[in-house]
From Swiss-Prot:
Keywords: Ribonucleoprotein, Ribosomal protein, RNA-binding, rRNA-binding. PANTHER family: 39S RIBOSOMAL PROTEIN L20 (PTHR10986). One of its GO terms (molecular function) is structural constituent of ribosome. Transmembrane segments: none annotated. GO terms for cellular component: ribonucleoprotein complex; ribosome. This is Large ribosomal subunit protein bL20. It comes from the Bacteria.
Amino acid sequence: MPRVKRGVQARARHKKVLKQAKGYYGARSRVYRVAFQAVTKAGQYAYRDRRNKKRVFRQLWIARINAAARQNEMSYSRFINGLKKASIEIDRKILADIAVFDKVAFAALVEKAKAAL
């Protein structure tokens, strides 16, 4: 069996990991063994949090809509129910944006939701 030398592949793999670990503190950006662990863990966190981000933003939108709806004497759940009955299909992201930046338009939506209930 012929001898196999793998120095080139190992060097390339190490360089790739160390490049990904650029900006990390101390040994995490300089030592392959430590950098590999740091990069792997960072990848796990990134994967998990890309999914978690969707939940977090939905919670934020609901909190903003609820706060704006309560300023107009209506709860979040009754507001959403009223919009559904009024056949107004605006997603929570846009509703939250309207609630923050256009109070008059949001108040009009609340009135339409109240009328539909």
